Amino acid sequence: MPKITIITVCFNAEKYIEQTIKSVTEQKGCDVEYIVIDGASTDSTQQIIQKYESGITKWVSEPDKGIADAMNKGVALATGDYLMFLNADDYFQTPDAIAMVVSQMKDDRDIYIFDTIFLKKEGGLRRHSGTFGKRINFKGLCHQGVLCKRELFQKVGSFDASFKICMDYDFFMRAYRHGATGNHVDEVLSVMRDGGISSRQDWPSLKQRFAEEKRVHLENNTSAFMKIIYTVYWTVYLPYRKMRFAFK
């Protein structure tokens, strides 16, 4: 049975961190290592972590340089065969979620992709599916539904801390470029709340996310044809989204 490392990064996350932690510590029928990386929270986050300390393998609380830096700290501490990130606004849908994941690991892929439920602020749910193939050139993956082999980080490198939003998309694109193998499983693994940095809908946040996505596209493709496709795509798409935002 493969050992699964679950990493939670958080900062001032007292509102939801308890649900996240409980959803991990209540997993059954599997070998789980749980690592929590707190960015020196000033609210009650650390006290909540301490409350569940017996179910947490390792945790640290210290200042970091952003989400990517915190995620890299988690990777450095991990000893599992596969790693996944379940951050402070996310939680597993069921107590046997990881047991379900392990039951699907039959073909030794580098990456396993499961579905994620997106919980909207205004109410309602949306199911997000992803695939690891050519489609990733235009559509990223929800890291809350993805497990990666630990050795993949040794081959591909860590998360690029110069990204504030799209560090996971950049990592998956680099993994694809390095020939990593992936498999999509049509099962829901986790729930992701609206409100994280990647789901903000104000124009400055959208503009930053689009700028980072464009950078991911252009830096992770050596094909002249794809660079032309991306240049045309962003020349059209960015003004379209700006106009759409203006008329909301």
Model-derived regions: residue spans:
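Short, surface-exposed amphipathic charged segments that create phosphate/polyanion-binding patches used
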Residues: 73, 246-247
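Nucleotide-sugar donor-binding/catalytic module of glycosyltransferases
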Residues: 1-202
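Catalytic core of nucleotide-sugar-dependent glycosyltransferases
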Residues: 192, 201-226
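A transmembrane-helix-recognition feature enriched in membrane-embedded lipid enzymes
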Residues: 220-246
